[in-house]
C-alpha cells in the first residue's frame, strides 16, 4: 500500500509545478549567464525624461496647428512673366518664309508638322536651304527668327520669317511616386508649375503623403506641402519646373498612429489627407473597453525630436480624463501627429480580476493535489 502511494507522489508534484507555471503569463527570458553590455545611462530616471500635460481647452488651443492662409507667390509670378522657352537638341522647328513656298516645308495632307519640320541635331544645329547650318540650341524663337532673317536677306529681299516649335522633345521634368499617372512631362513654351504637373499626372492617389512632397532641382531637395498649396491656397508652395527637375510624392506609410492598451481593437492606424483626431483614433479602435479600462487614464505619448530631444526629454505625454463624457469635445479637437501612441490604462479592479484569473490554475492545482493526497491516504 505504501509503495503505491510513493509511486503517485511524482505525478502530484508534476501537476503542481505545471499548474504553478501559469501564474506568470507569457514568455520570459533570463539574462543570467549572458553577456550584458553595460550602458553609460543605464541608471536613467524615466520620470524625468518626459513631460506630462493634462489636456485642457487652453492647451488644445495652443497645440492646434495654425491654418495656412492663401498667399501670393511674387517670385513665381515674376518667373512666369519672364519665362522664355529655349530650344534644345531633339526639338522640331517649323520655319515659314512668306511668299516663298519653295523655302517653306509643306506639311502635306497626311503628314504632321513634326514629321516634316526641321530637327535640331545633337550638335545644336539645324539645316535650312541657302543658309546651311543654323545654330539654334539655347536660343529663343525670337533669336532664331532674327538670325534666319538676317542670313536669308543675302538671297531674298526683305524676307518675312516665322519660326515655331512643332514638337517639344528636348526638355522634360519627371513626376513619380503616388500619382495616378507617373512619368515624364515635356517642358514647353507654356510654363509648367508643380500644380500643373500634379494635375497632368491625374492627381494624387489615396496613399500619397501630400505634406512631404520632394522637389529635386539642380541636385538639391526641397520639401513641398501640397496640402498647404491645394487645400489652403498657399501659392508659396508652388514652383516653376525646369528641365531635369524631379517631383516625388512619397507614400503615407509614415503617417500612422498606434492605439494600445484597454481598447477593443489594438491597431496601427494610417492618417488620411485630413489627419486624425484622438476621437477618430479611439473610434477606429472600436472604442475603449468599458469593463477593463480606466477612463481617466487615456494618454497620448508623443516622441520628441530636435530641440526637445536635445534637452534630455524623450516624449511629451498628454492625459485625457474621459470619466466625464463631455471631455470627448476636447478629444475631437486634439489632433494627432505621426507616430503618436494612444494608450488606455487598465482600471484597478481589472488588474485585480486579472491577478485572480492568473492564480486560479495554481489554486486549482493545489486543491487537486490536496484532494488526491487525501484519496491516497484513504486508499
Curated annotation (Swiss-Prot):
Membrane-protein topology: Multi-pass membrane protein
Signal sequence, start to end: 1-20
GO biological process, one term: polysaccharide transport
Keywords, in A-Z order: Cell outer membrane, Exopolysaccharide synthesis, Ion transport, Lipoprotein, Membrane, Palmitate, Polysaccharide transport, Porin, Signal, Sugar transport, Transmembrane, Transmembrane beta strand, Transport
Localization terms from the record: Cell outer membrane
Pathway(s) served: Glycan metabolism; exopolysaccharide biosynthesis
Pfam families the UniProt entry points to: Poly_export (PF02563), SLBB_2 (PF22461), Wza_C (PF18412)
Lipidation (S-diacylglycerol cysteine): 21
Entry GO MF terms: polysaccharide transmembrane transporter activity; porin activity
N-palmitoyl cysteine: lipidated positions: 21
Protein purpose: Probably involved in the export of the extracellular polysaccharide colanic acid from the cell to medium.
Family under the similarity heading: Belongs to the BexD/CtrA/VexA family.
NCBIfam families: PRK15078.1
Name used for this protein in its record: Putative polysaccharide export protein Wza
Organism per entry: Escherichia coli (strain K12)
Amino acid at each position: 500500500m505504501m509503495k503505491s502511494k510513493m509511486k503517485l507522489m511524482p505525478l502530484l508534484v508534476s501537476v503542481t509545478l505545471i499548474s504553478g507555471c501559469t501564474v506568470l503569463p507569457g514568455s520570459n527570458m533570463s539574462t543570467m549567464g549572458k553577456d550584458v553590455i553595460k550602458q553609460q545611462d543605464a541608471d536613467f530616471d524615466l520620470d524625468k525624461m518626459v513631460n506630462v500635460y493634462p489636456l485642457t481647452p487652453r492647451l488644445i488651443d495652443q497645440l492646434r496647428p495654425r491654418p495656412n492662409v492663401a498667399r501670393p507667390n511674387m517670385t513665381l509670378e515674376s518667373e512666369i512673366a519672364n519665362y522664355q522657352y529655349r530650344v534644345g537638341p531633339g526639338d522640331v522647328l517649323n520655319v515659314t518664309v512668306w511668299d516663298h513656298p519653295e523655302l517653306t516645308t509643306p506639311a502635306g495632307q497626311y503628314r504632321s508638322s513634326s514629321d516634316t519640320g526641321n530637327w535640331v541635331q545633337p550638335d545644336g544645329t539645324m539645316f535650312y536651304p541657302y543658309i546651311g547650318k543654323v545654330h539654334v540650341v539655347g536660343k529663343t524663337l525670337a533669336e532664331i527668327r532674327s538670325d534666319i532673317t538676317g542670313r536669308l536677306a543675302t538671297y531674298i529681299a526683305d524676307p518675312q520669317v516665322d519660326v515655331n516649335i512643332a514638337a517639344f522633345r528636348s526638355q522634360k521634368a519627371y513626376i513619380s511616386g503616388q500619382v495616378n499617372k507617373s512619368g515624364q512631362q515635356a517642358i514647353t513654351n507654356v510654363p509648367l508649375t508643380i500644380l500643373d504637373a500634379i494635375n497632368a499626372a491625374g492627381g494624387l492617389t489615396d496613399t500619397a503623403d501630400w505634406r512631404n512632397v520632394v522637389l529635386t532641382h539642380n541636385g538639391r531637395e526641397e520639401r513641398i506641402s501640397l496640402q498647404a498649396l491645394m487645400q489652403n491656397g498657399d501659392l508659396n508652395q508652388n514652383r516653376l519646373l525646369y528641365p531635369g527637375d524631379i517631383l516625388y510624392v512619397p507614400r503615407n506609410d509614415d503617417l500612422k498612429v498606434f492605439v494600445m492598451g484597454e481598447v477593443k481593437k489594438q491597431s496601427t492606424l494610417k492618417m488620411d489627407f485630413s489627419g486624425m483626431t484622438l476621437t477618430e483614433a479611439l473610434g477606429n479602435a472600436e472604442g475603449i473597453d468599458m469593463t477593463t479600462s480606466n477612463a481617466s487614464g487615456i494618454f497620448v505619448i508623443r516622441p520628441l525630436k530636435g530641440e526637445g530631444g536635445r534637452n534630455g526629454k524623450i516624449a511629451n505625454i498628454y492625459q485625457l480624463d474621459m470619466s466625464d463624457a463631455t471631455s470627448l469635445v476636447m478629444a475631437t479637437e486634439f489632433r494627432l501627429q505621426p507616430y503618436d501612441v494612444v494608450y488606455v490604462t487598465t482600471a484597478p479592479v481589472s488588474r485585480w480580476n486579472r491577478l485572480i484569473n492568473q492564480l486560479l490554475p495554481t489554486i486549482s492545482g493545489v486543491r487537486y493535489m490536496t484532494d488526491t493526497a487525501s484519496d491516497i491516504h484513504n486508499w
